[in-house]
Every structure is written in C-alpha cells, then in structure tokens.
Design a protein with these regions (language model features):
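Terminal, compositionally biased non-globular sequences in eukaryotic proteins
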Residues: 1-70, 74-245
Length: 245
C-alpha cells in the first residue's frame, strides 16, 4: 500500500534546494545544497532536475518560459526516511530577467521518479542585473532618469540575436537634469549576443519599444556596451536621447 501511495505523491521522497542567498546576479554562479529526504518507502531516483523559470506577456496572454534547465546526479535509491545532501553549482544566465515588482524568477527542483508523481520544490529568487546592464542603469540615473516600470514581453525574433523568445523592457522617466522637460520616458531593452551587450533604446513613444520594433519602426537606436563603465556610457546615452527626442 505504501508503494501505491508513494507513486501518487503521498509519502513520497521530498527535495529542497538551499541557496546561500536569495539575491543572485545574472551572469554569475552560486553554490547550492540539495536536500533529498526519503518518504515512507524506498524509491529509485533517476535524477534531480532543475529549471530556471519566469513568465512573459504575449498577444495570447502570459506564458511560462524556461530560461535554463539541467540535471544533477546519476540514478540512486533513497531509502525510507533517509536524508541525502548534494552540492551543485547553479549558473544564472546573463539573459535572466531582473526581478522587479512585475517580474518574478524561480528555481524549480524536482525528483525524476519512474512511474510516480515527481515531487518538487520552488524557490523564488531575486535577480540583480549584470554589471554592464547595471552600468547602463547607473548612467541613466546620472542623466536624471529613474526606473518607472519593467516587463518581460514576446520579442521580435528578427530584430534580436538571442535564443530566447522574449525580452525584458525597462521604462525610465526623467526626474531632473537636461531631459526633465524634453522627454516623457526612455525605454531600453538589453540583449546579450555572445559576450556583447546591445541596448535597444527608444525615446518618448506611446507604444512600447518591443511593439514598435515588431513593426520595424525606425524611430529607435541601439548601443553596444563592452565594459561596465557608467562614465563612458553616459555621454553616448545622452547623445542618443537627444537625437531621438
């Protein structure tokens, strides 16, 4: 009877991912500890698997997106009540969205058990921008802009060199400085291609940047960021904003 219950998830083994911190930076790695505890009966575990997930907005509504996925360990047997711990390195891809009030990212951990309901664990994490993306944010701050909103949206694949089918858009509004009386907002979409960061930028448009780019609108520009240097990025951003405003 215990075997039957375990197969439908009752009294089955459990898994928990323990991170040293809830705040991670895109493009970096973190060591994690995986805790597996046996249930009421012995079970054969084919693998421990992970998925880094978020969601994005499309014309059909919100869709789930897997940013990255991988597996850990060779098959093993977890005995009833046994506790096992594994260590692994979790890589946070550079394309991972920055978490905000409207954007969430989670790590899902599961046990692959044949002929049974796979038990799992979900951990929401805070994702900070890559150093180069943060440098762009810092440059905008120096120009008097503050972040107003962000969202993950379906992207125009022909305009983005990326394997993802979505991109994160950030909307900044001027609070002070030269552009306070000149523009309503600046929208940017950072996109990584190999080791290069391209920042797509639009100024003072009613439609969102991703929507405009889908229509091949030419009222936008892009910048390439090679180093996390806000002082070098700031004048280039200022020139681009002036040209588009």
């Amino acid at each position: 009877m215990k075997d039957v219950l375990s197969r439908i998830g009752i009294g089955s083994a459990t898994v928990d991912t323990v991170l040293p911190t809830d705040s991670l930076r895109a493009g970096e790695s973190v060591r994690a500890e995986i805790h597996v505890e046996g249930g009421s009966t012995d079970q054969d575990i084919d693998a421990v698997y992970f998925a880094l997930e978020t969601e994005y907005k499309s014309d059909e509504g919100y869709k789930d997106a897997i940013i990255d996925q991988w597996k850990l360990t060779e098959p093993f047997t977890i005995e009833a009540g046994e506790q096992r711990r594994f260590e692994t390195t979790i890589d946070i891809p550079r394309e991972t969205p920055v978490t905000t009030r409207s954007t969430a990212v989670e790590i899902e951990t599961g046990l692959d058990i044949s002929m049974a309901v796979d038990p799992g664990d979900e951990d929401y994490i805070e994702v900070e921008p890559t150093h180069r993306t943060q440098a762009v944010f810092d440059a905008l701050d120096s120009l008097g802009f503050s972040l107003h909103a962000s969202a993950c949206e379906a992207a125009a694949g022909s305009l983005f060199t990326t394997s993802a089918n979505f991109a994160q858009e950030f909307e900044f509004r001027p609070q002070r400085g030269e552009f306070a009386d000149q523009v309503d907002e600046v929208e940017i979409v950072p996109v990584f291609d190999d080791d290069r960061l391209t920042v797509y930028l639009e100024v003072d448009r009613n439609a969102g940047l991703l929507s405009e780019m889908t229509d091949a609108d030419e009222r936008h520009t892009k910048l390439t960021v090679d180093a996390p240097d806000p002082d070098a990025i700031e004048p280039r951003l200022a020139d681009a904003i002036r040209e588009l405003s």
